[in-house]
């Protein structure tokens, strides 16, 4: 879906067209989920934050301005919701006892992730992982990522290339280890 098509759907949603929301959801859910996963690295949290992002989209659609970057707007909502949730969870977990963690455990899907995703989680920082996910998985252009993140295009390209080099090195190291 192009930015212009998404912009039109956002405007339809502003006017109360419920079918526009369904189309927005169906056309953006895969990329948005991958983006959220790159931030929180937990499947259940990503599902929850995706729901939160779409709820906030609906409740704040009146703030959307025609012609602005709808993808950047939606991804910013998702990013802010996810970061807020992670910060809230950190505060809560700081007050929980070690026994609770040992008793109930925590869920991690690292074992179920692809080797590339595991390598991303292992060697990339949050910003690098975000850029790689937005470009390689969600299909955004470097210019669009720069708009979304508020970084210069050159910095986005440099971070992307640097992240790819780290991933390549890590995957080669893992491949050598297996052979």
Please report, for each region that a protein language model flagged, where it lies by residue.
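Internal acidic/polar
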Residues: 3, 84, 91-121, 141
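N-terminal module of bacterial RNA polymerase sigma factors
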Residues: 1-31, 122, 147-149, 169, ...
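Arg/Lys-rich amphipathic alpha helix in sigma70-family domain 2
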Residues: 59-66, 76-96
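Structural recognition of an alpha-helix C-terminal capping motif at a helix-to-coil junction
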Residues: 34, 48-55, 68-80, 158
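Sigma70-family region 2
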Residues: 14-15, 41, 52-69, 88-89
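Short, charged helix-capping/linker segments at alpha-helix termini
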Residues: 14-23, 33-52, 153, 176-179
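A short pre-motif secondary-structure segment
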Residues: 131-135
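DNA-recognition helix of helix-turn-helix
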Residues: 83, 137, 143, 147-178
